[in-house]
Amino acid sequence: MQMNSLNDPKHLVKAVVRGEIKCLDVRAQSKYEISHLRKSVNIPSEKISKCWYQLPAKQEELFVVEDQGDKIETEETGTCAQQLKKRGWNIAGHFMFSHKIWEDLSLPQNELLESGPNRNLLFEPCPYLKEVMPVVEKGIKTNNARVLDIGCGSGRDLAWICFRESGKHWMVSALDAEKRAIQRFSELFSGLGLEDRIEGKKVAKVDASGLWKLYTRDGKQEPNATAISLADMLADFQNVPEGDVYKYDLVLQIRFLNRALLRQSSSLLRNNGFLFLCTFVNDGVHQYEHPRGSDHRFEKGEAAAIVSESDGRIRVLKDEIGFIEDGRPVQILLAQKVE
């Protein structure tokens, strides 16, 4: 048994179980499912190089559990924890898994270990989405809820919505202009056992007028494709309840900006449905370089004005300025379509 940590080993292990420190277990899935630390997350070492987006933010403390010989990159020296530290992750400690370790630490196995598949996530969603979800789920009248993420990226926000225990059964649809993003979204949902929550996913790009062009899974534009409306595109999604194809309980636009599309928000929402937006803004105080131009930044108060003027049934519940990790300001908007 080997134990390496920057702090007291008992403290670190107990902190993992209490949910105070994230824990990455890089052992083979079969070994993980036999026995692992409570609240740890399994990504086998050979898969990590394709799953960076599933790791926590680099500044967060991370505890690593591994077997002798586990490596992220076979040509590199060092353990997985050491290889992660080289890449900038904040490694609080690590150990080589062994049942003898609990004897060495005088810790009770039955309180710290569990078996079975992964039940946790290493990453966090957009913090402002996490903040408003209790309001959203309280305001939605159905337990079978539907969410559309426009500009979904790797799908982490959607995965977080579905993976936690909330009393709502969320079905998801995902759009992104990048084929790699949709591939990652698919891989993430597959790895978490959430494939049956996907109603639809598409590689599609929207122009300034709000019209869309579809692309194949290879990232090539569909042959003979013409620009189509959002409604026409969503009509092609699979696993969508008949007669309910265009309506969602929650629409997400996170680090995505299209004013024409924002004006269509009401047409996408069920009664009592919510729009959540978090994207870059000129707040009149902070100066930053990227992204540049009005195509990628709202003016302060602009987003709220657009959705309010588009339909009198849209009620703005939150209109605030927030900040992402590097200090750049973002517009935070939560709006609801009232009956």
Swiss-Prot record:
Gene Ontology CC: cytosol; nucleus
Tree of life domain: Eukaryota
Stretches assigned to the Rhodanese domain: 17-111
InterPro entries reported for this sequence: Rhodanese-like_dom, Rhodanese-like_dom_sf, SAM-dependent_MTases_sf
GO MF annotation terms: methyltransferase activity
CDD domains in the cross-refs: AdoMet_MTases (cd02440)
Xref: Pfam families: Methyltransf_23
Name the UniProt record assigns to this protein: Uncharacterized protein UNK4.09
Provenance organism: Schizosaccharomyces pombe (strain 972 / ATCC 24843)
